[in-house]
């Protein structure tokens, strides 16, 4: 931390400078400078490291767990929070020294985890935060989750929140089926017991952790600043990947979210993977129906419009050099697929 104890300081090691890569090209370019976090968006942290700290449901569990030990989570510095994350976060980043809060807990049956989550979220019980937290992998988002490993690989399993309908897991499954049919890359996914949606982790391959960064981290936008526009996201995709195929894939995701009414398209719901110094967009995730959004609008606007039109989608595409005819073709294709698979 800086002397004011309010802003983080970061410097790449000599060894990393010799053959590493920038973990966040816009905020932390690969050079020997001493970087000081400039924005207060992440409570004095850098966006890329704030990505590792749980938000939403995970933050809620951690705060309650710490409160049992007499610790006010809101008084902890970013470095102290990262120390609690330690090696248990998503992606390749790990933080030493580690601070352990409580003890590891075995993964219960999924039905039991769902019941425990309901009890904690509805504040009927305060005794199971540790079980839920230690099986969440410090994942973000508002809904309960757990990490699970089976013969097929490593999975992130979602549970219902107290306000979700009974068929919420099946709905997300259907949305992923539709997204794949729309030409969108999604992780391998499955529906467990016809109610728990599970997606294979894309931050692990052959047992190795991959570096993953959200668009929010890379652009310096927190969840409290819903100012991202798909225009920015498309240009970020072009800048990082230098690949028009990846840009068109991101365009497809924008079109799908608008047509399928997934308005929970905030900056942490888009990620990039860096492997051997080369960036690519991650498989799409958190694809489901969300008509409420943010005051009824998309969290990420399209050319400044939170309720985007077809013309806005085309403008966003042509702005990044996708031909207008190709934009129209993709929009019509996705609209027809969603009409067939999602509109009931």
Features from the language model and the residues they span:
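Phosphate/dinucleotide-binding and metal-coordinating scaffold of catalytic cores
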Residues: 1-267, 271-344
């Amino acid at each position: 931390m800086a002397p004011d104890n309010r802003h983080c300081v970061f410097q790449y090691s000599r060894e990393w400078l010799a053959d590493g890569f920038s973990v966040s090209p816009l905020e932390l370019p690969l050079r020997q400078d001493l970087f000081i976090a400039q924005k207060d968006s992440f409570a004095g942290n850098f966006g890329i490291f704030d990505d590792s700290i749980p938000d939403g449901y995970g933050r809620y569990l951690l705060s309650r767990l710490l409160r049992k030990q007499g610790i006010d989570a809101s008084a902890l510095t970013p470095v102290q929070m990262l120390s609690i994350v330690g090696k248990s976060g998503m992606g390749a980043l790990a933080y030493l020294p580690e601070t352990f809060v409580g003890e590891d807990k075995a993964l219960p049956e999924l039905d039991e985890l769902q019941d425990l989550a309901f009890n904690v979220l509805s504040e009927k019980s305060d005794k199971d935060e540790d079980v839920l937290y230690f099986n969440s992998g410090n994942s973000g988002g508002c809904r309960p989750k757990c990490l699970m490993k089976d013969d097929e690989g490593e999975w992130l399993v979602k549970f219902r929140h107290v306000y979700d309908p009974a068929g919420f897991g099946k709905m997300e499954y259907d949305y992923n089926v539709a997204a794949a049919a729309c030409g969108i890359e999604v992780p391998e996914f499955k529906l467990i017991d016809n109610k728990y949606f599970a997606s294979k982790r894309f931050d692990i391959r052959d047992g190795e952790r991959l570096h993953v960064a959200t668009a929010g981290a890379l652009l310096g936008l927190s969840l409290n600043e819903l100012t991202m526009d798909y225009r920015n996201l498309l240009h970020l995709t072009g800048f990082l990947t230098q690949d028009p195929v990846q840009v068109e894939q991101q365009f497809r995701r924008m079109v799908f979210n608008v047509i399928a009414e997934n308005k929970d398209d905030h900056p942490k719901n888009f990620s990039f993977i860096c492997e051997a110094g080369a960036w690519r967009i991650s498989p799409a995730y958190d694809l489901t129906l969300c008509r409420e959004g943010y005051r009824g609008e998309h969290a990420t606007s399209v050319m400044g419009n939170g309720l985007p039109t077809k013309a806005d989608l085309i403008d966003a595409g042509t702005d990044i050099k996708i031909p207008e005819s190709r934009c129209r073709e993709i929009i019509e294709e996705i609209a027809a697929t969603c009409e067939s698979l999602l509109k009931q």
